[in-house]
Swiss-Prot record:
<dbReference type="InterPro" id="IPR036910">
    <property type="entry name" value="HMG_box_dom_sf"/>
</dbReference>
<dbReference type="InterPro" id="IPR050140">
    <property type="entry name" value="SRY-related_HMG-box_TF-like"/>
</dbReference>
<feature type="compositionally biased region" description="Polar residues">
    <location>
        <begin position="1"/>
        <end position="13"/>
    </location>
</feature>
<dbReference type="GO" id="GO:0005634">
    <property type="term" value="C:nucleus"/>
</dbReference>
<feature type="compositionally biased region" description="Low complexity">
    <location>
        <begin position="160"/>
        <end position="175"/>
    </location>
</feature>
<feature type="region of interest" description="Disordered">
    <location>
        <begin position="1"/>
        <end position="22"/>
    </location>
</feature>
<feature type="compositionally biased region" description="Acidic residues">
    <location>
        <begin position="223"/>
        <end position="232"/>
    </location>
</feature>
<dbReference type="GO" id="GO:0001228">
    <property type="term" value="F:DNA-binding transcription activator activity, RNA polymerase II-specific"/>
</dbReference>
<keyword id="KW-0217">Developmental protein</keyword>
<keyword id="KW-0221">Differentiation</keyword>
<dbReference type="GO" id="GO:0003677">
    <property type="term" value="F:DNA binding"/>
</dbReference>
<dbReference type="GO" id="GO:0007420">
    <property type="term" value="P:brain development"/>
</dbReference>
<protein>
    <recommendedName>
        <fullName>Transcription factor SOX-11</fullName>
    </recommendedName>
</protein>
<dbReference type="InterPro" id="IPR009071">
    <property type="entry name" value="HMG_box_dom"/>
</dbReference>
<keyword id="KW-0238">DNA-binding</keyword>
<dbReference type="GO" id="GO:0000978">
    <property type="term" value="F:RNA polymerase II cis-regulatory region sequence-specific DNA binding"/>
</dbReference>
<dbReference type="GO" id="GO:0000122">
    <property type="term" value="P:negative regulation of transcription by RNA polymerase II"/>
</dbReference>
Length: 396
């Protein structure tokens, strides 16, 4: 029993001794162990303190020397690629001694350089249009030089901000409202402000943010002012919303009619002289209008109104031409001795001849109460086409 215990203790001591020998060999062949006697073992020639090596750096430094001894002509980049692949293929148990060595170096680095703090170099983002000086390179710049370049870039950006925030000159914006010159100015200011945001690297960040907020507020106010200036007037709206009725008659009683009963809405433009415009209103089914006094209707305008009503009533079909006997009855005077009503229309014959048209119509129809008499309204309400199919074919 005692012999078995001694043998077990000897077997348990074997791996420890093996690990100690491996670590001793590693420390002997490690290049870092030879340089630790120097107080400046982790400093460069320029006085820069290097970072402590990690496990991969410790391992790759040893393996790189071996590869360089075997193949001295191999490129450094190729050696690094091979070392990276080999490190990934290593087992975790094989990485343990290098991890321990890296931890030892880290603790020694902390003891030798207690005030060390990792400060990576910040390369200032330069404007692509600005060319760097030939005498200065970003790699050789000291920390003080980097701050100077950042301040100079901040000054340039402040100049750009001032140029963007300044209001435009009165002579610069001479284009009319329809050419969208104001939009180009707003977009240009936004582009300048975006460039300024990209190249700001000064320490006074709060002041820069306040300047940016003021710049955005000014741009927004200018855009609102331009939108108010570019609002279309009533004359511009008439160009798109109204339709002109050609050869419209003189409507003396159009102002006296109500808005609900009228199909068209009269709009007169101030710049158009005496031209008359109409815009469509809601068309609803209504009964026959109440009798109104006849308006002045010239004989030449009645065929035109019948033509228009026929086109709208028939949905694009050819209009019904009035009969010759109706045309002969138009010049007659309805009231005897009326000098002022010389052009009034006597529609008694029209009412008699077109009774057949008004018998079968009880639906909706277009109404012209501004200048239509009840007889003419009943005539318009009638069917314009015969029921026979042969009558639908028109020959010209």
């Amino acid at each position: 029993m005692v012999q078995q215990a001694e043998s077990a203790e000897s077997e348990s001591n074997l791996p420890r001794e093996a690990m100690d020998t491996e670590e001793g060999e590693f420390m002997a062949c490690s290049p870092v162990a030879l340089d630790e006697s120097d107080p400046d073992w982790c400093k460069t020639a320029s006085g820069h303190i290097k970072r402590p090596m990690n496990a991969f750096m410790v391992w790759s430094k040893i393996e790189r020397r071996k590869i360089m001894e075997q193949s001295p002509d191999m490129h450094n980049a190729e050696i690094s690629k091979r070392l990276g692949k080999r490190w990934k293929m290593l087992k975790d148990s094989e990485k343990i001694p290098f991890i321990r060595e890296a931890e030892r170096l880290r603790l020694k680095h902390m003891a030798d350089y207690p005030d060390y703090k990792y400060r990576p170099r910040k390369k200032p983002k330069m404007d692509p249009s600005a060319k760097p000086n030939a005498g200065q390179s970003p790699e050789k710049n000291a920390p003080g030089g980097g701050s100077k370049s950042a301040k100079s870039s901040g000054k340039k950006c402040s100049k750009l901000k001032a140029a963007a925030a300044s209001p435009p000159k009165p002579g610069a914006k001479a284009a009319p409202h329809g050419d969208y010159a104001g939009d180009e100015y707003v977009f240009g200011a936004l582009k300048v402000s975006s460039k300024a945001v990209k190249c700001v690297f000064v320490d006074e960040e709060e002041e820069d943010e306040e300047d940016e907020d003021e710049l955005q507020l000014r741009i927004k106010q200018e855009a609102d002012d331009e939108e108010e200036d570019e609002e279309p007037g009533p004359q511009q709206l008439r160009r798109y919303n109204v339709a002109k009725v050609p050869a419209s008659p003189t409507l003396s009683s159009s102002a006296e009619s109500t808005e609900g009963a009228s199909l068209y809405e009269e709009v007169r433009g101030a710049a158009g002289g005496g031209r008359l415009y109409y815009s469509f209103k809601n068309i609803t089914k209504q009964g026959p209008p109440p009798p109104q006094p006849p308006a002045g209707l010239s004989p030449a305008s009645v065929p035109l109104h019948l033509h228009l009503v026929g086109r709208q009533r028939g949905g694009g079909r050819p209009p019904v031409r009035p009969q010759p006997q109706l045309l002969a009855a138009w010049p007659r005077r309805r009231r005897a001795g009326g000098g002022a009503a010389a052009g009034n229309l006597s529609l008694s014959l029209v009412d008699k001849d077109l009774d057949s048209f008004s018998e079968g119509s009880l639906g909706s129809h277009f109404e012209f109460p501004d200048y239509c008499t009840p007889e003419l309204s009943e005539m318009i309400a009638g069917d314009w086409l015969e029921a026979n199919f042969s009558d639908l074919v028109f020959t010209y």
